[in-house]
């Protein structure tokens, strides 16, 4: 099986320094490496990981690139490329191509509702830099992975209509249920994105939605709606590990890696064995590893 979304970092600050402004006290844990995750995940059958660039490394992808190079076929990466910046840097599409050569094959974009205000209007993707990223994603089969909330859906819908060939991922079930309830209008809006054939959804981060208590059964209704709309071929399971983050009440124990897996593997009885194989392995394998 494949975990399509984990965060990792090292405590070797000399070799992999934190970005300016960050210090070791900012880290959720002293370290959280791919090896740490795999020690927990492999006994459960989860043997491959998508490493999502951690905030405190900024734009320096050295750590995940090094991990991927040391673990070919086991690790793959999602990076960060700024589409809009006030400093002189590479064109975002050129940066995407360069990073893809290091095994970083998806690129995270934060939605307007999921980041600090930048002074942009409702069409927050209306910028030549984002056009370049969408175009490059189509031409190179590099996914754009969106950390968004439901209010961001209309703008993403507009861009997916403009660039229908670009692979797009919605992280964390679009944040639905993060405030407790699972509003029908938000679920319908997310499911409406299924009209775009290259839009996929990461199903997970169950610790952060609904009652926020394992076994997370209150998330099953949302999972069912999303899988029915997108099909299991466009859904992939994630944990968003680490699941324990000191200072964050929503991620304190008893959240466990196995509980996140068990919701799909054991409790989603509306899914067939084939559906579960696609969600837990095949969708992520096809997008990230079968290149």
Range-by-range predicted roles:
Residues 1-2, 6-9, 123, 133, ...:
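A generic "structured core" feature
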Residues 1-59, 258:
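An N-terminally biased module of ancient metal coordination in phosphate/nucleic-acid-related enzymes
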Residues 177-179, 183-291:
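H/E-rich (His + Asp/Glu) clusters that bind or coordinate divalent metals
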Residues 59-74, 160-169, 222-228, 252-267:
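Short, electropositive alpha-helical surface patch
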Residues 2-6, 49-52, 76-79, 107-109, ...:
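Hydrophobic faces of well-ordered beta-strands that scaffold small-molecule active sites
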Residues 58-151, 158, 200-206, 212-213:
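Active-site gating/metal-coordination segments in enzymes
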Residues 30-40, 86-99, 185-186:
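Short, acidic/polar
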């Amino acid at each position: 099986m494949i975990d399509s979304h984990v965060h990792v970092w090292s405590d070797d600050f000399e070799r992999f320094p934190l970005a300016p402004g960050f210090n070791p006290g900012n880290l959720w844990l002293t370290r959280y490496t791919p090896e740490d995750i795999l020690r927990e995940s492999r006994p459960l059958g989860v043997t491959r990981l998508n490493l999502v660039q951690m905030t405190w490394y900024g734009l320096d992808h050295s750590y995940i690139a090094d991990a991927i190079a040391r673990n070919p076929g086991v690790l793959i990466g999602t990076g960060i490329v700024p589409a809009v910046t006030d400093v002189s840097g590479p064109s975002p599409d050129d940066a995407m191509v360069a990073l893809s050569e290091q095994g970083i094959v998806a690129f995270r974009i934060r939605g307007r509702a999921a980041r600090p205000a930048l002074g942009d209007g409702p069409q927050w993707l209306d910028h030549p830099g984002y056009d370049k990223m969408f175009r490059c994603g189509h031409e190179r089969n590099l996914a754009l992975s969106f950390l968004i909330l439901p209010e961001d859906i209309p703008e993403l819908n507009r861009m997916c209509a403009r660039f229908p060939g670009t692979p797009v991922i919605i992280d964390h079930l679009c944040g639905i249920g993060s405030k407790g309830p699972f509003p029908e209008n938000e679920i319908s809006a997310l499911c409406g994105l299924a009209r775009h054939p290259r839009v996929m959804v990461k199903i997970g981060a169950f610790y952060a939605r609904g009652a926020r208590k394992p076994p997370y059964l209150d998330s099953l209704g949302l999972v069912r709606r999303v899988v029915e709309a997108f099909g299991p071929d466009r859904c992939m399971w994630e944990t968003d590990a680490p699941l324990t983050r000191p200072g964050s009440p929503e991620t304190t124990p008893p959240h466990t890696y196995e509980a996140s897996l068990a919701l799909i593997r054991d409790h989603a009885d509306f899914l067939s064995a084939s559906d579960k194989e696609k969600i837990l392995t095949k969708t992520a394998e096809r997008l990230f590893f079968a290149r």
